[in-house]
């Protein structure tokens, strides 16, 4: 079963991206564009 996750910007704490993945113990960390900060920032998976 695939599980939804939300990526949150580490700078402004804005929730920008939603995705699905297999259930894993590791948290996802990706550098993506934040429309609120208007630049590329590190996004981490919300708890």
UniProtKB/Swiss-Prot annotation:
Matches recorded under InterPro entries: Ribosomal_bL33, Ribosomal_bL33_sf, Ribosomal_zn-bd
Lineage: Bacteria, Bacillati, Mycoplasmatota, Mollicutes, Entomoplasmatales
Pfam families noted in UniProt: Ribosomal_L33
Signal sequence interval, chain numbering: none
UniProt keyword annotation of Ribonucleoprotein present: yes
Record family assignment: Belongs to the bacterial ribosomal protein bL33 family.
Protein name: Large ribosomal subunit protein bL33B
Example GO biological process: translation
Top-level taxon of origin: Bacteria
MF terms (GO), sorted A to Z: structural constituent of ribosome
Keywords: Ribonucleoprotein, Ribosomal protein
GO cellular component: cytoplasm; ribonucleoprotein complex; ribosome
Entries under Gene3D superfamilies matching the protein: Ribosomal protein L33
């Amino acid at each position: 079963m695939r599980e939804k996750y939300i990526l949150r910007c580490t700078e402004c704490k804005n929730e920008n991206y939603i995705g699905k993945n297999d259930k894993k113990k590791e948290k996802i960390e990706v550098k993506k564009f934040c429309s609120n900060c208007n630049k590329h920032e590190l996004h981490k998976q919300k708890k």
